[in-house]
Amino acid sequence: MELYLDTANIDEIKEIASYGLVDGVTTNPSIIAKSGRNFREVIKEICSIVSGPVSAEVLSTKFDGMMKEALELVEIAENVVIKVPLIPEGLKTVVELTKRNIPTNVTLCFSSSQALLAAKAGATYISPFIGRVDDTSWDGMELISEIREIYDNYGYDTRILAASIRGPMHLKESALRGADCATMPHSAFLQLFKHPLTDIGLEKFLEDSKKLKW
């Protein structure tokens, strides 16, 4: 399973990348706006740190605008993936970008029928928002299962990128239900390392190590 960071914070990306555990990065306009920096400069710097896919979202909601922005974004680096919202104009853009062999990530997916449309359009990735689905009192993990079954039934190559991951349980369930990859904020990524028994065991090892001669 591939693990992505959902952030535009350069320090956070450098930290996790230094562990050799991050496969890519996802961004969106809201995340980049928090940095207060130029959109393209941020994407360029991220691509220089991470060799895997870096999702950069178009800002327009119209086909012509999305195509123009997408073609400009892919010139930044070869690992840029064009992120588009799951709207009719967005999927129209995905169809055209797919013809040009430009990878795409369809975002803001909240239903299996939406995921089916994205796959038919040729999306490289589909990003179901697990945490936000849970917030509506529906089961976000069931959405992953439904998408996995539909894609397997019809042989779609679109990869399931579980998004809105809020902690280890979300990641575990996404992995068990067949998501190909998952993206999460820096704070959630750090939670993956944590377990109380690990802390207890480490404390014991460190205590006993004081008795050893090196």
From Swiss-Prot:
InterPro entries for the chain: Aldolase_TIM (IPR013785), TAL/FSA (IPR001585), Transaldolase_3B (IPR022999), Transaldolase_3B/F6P_aldolase (IPR004731), Transaldolase_AS (IPR018225), TSA/FSA_arc/bac (IPR033919)
Keyword Cytoplasm part of the UniProt annotation: yes
One of the protein's GO biological processes: carbohydrate metabolic process
Cellular component terms per the entry's GO annotation: cytoplasm
UniProt-listed Gene3D superfamilies: Aldolase class I
Pathway of action: Carbohydrate degradation; pentose phosphate pathway; D-glyceraldehyde 3-phosphate and beta-D-fructose 6-phosphate from D-ribose 5-phosphate and D-xylulose 5-phosphate (non-oxidative stage): step 2/3
Active-site positions on this chain: K83 (schiff-base intermediate with substrate)
Enzyme Commission designation: 2.2.1.2
Catalytic activity: D-sedoheptulose 7-phosphate + D-glyceraldehyde 3-phosphate = D-erythrose 4-phosphate + beta-D-fructose 6-phosphate
MF terms in GO: aldehyde-lyase activity; transaldolase activity
Keyword match Transferase: yes
Pfam families according to UniProt: TAL_FSA (PF00923)
Record's keyword terms, sorted: Cytoplasm, Pentose shunt, Schiff base, Transferase
SUPFAM superfamilies per record: Aldolase (SSF51569)
Compartmental location: Cytoplasm
Protein family per UniProt: Belongs to the transaldolase family. Type 3B subfamily.
Cross-referenced PANTHER family: FRUCTOSE-6-PHOSPHATE ALDOLASE 1-RELATED (PTHR10683:SF40), TRANSALDOLASE (PTHR10683)
Protein task: Transaldolase is important for the balance of metabolites in the pentose-phosphate pathway.
Matching HAMAP family: Transaldolase_3b
Name of the molecule in the record: Probable transaldolase
Top-level taxonomy: Bacteria, Pseudomonadati, Spirochaetota, Spirochaetia, Leptospirales
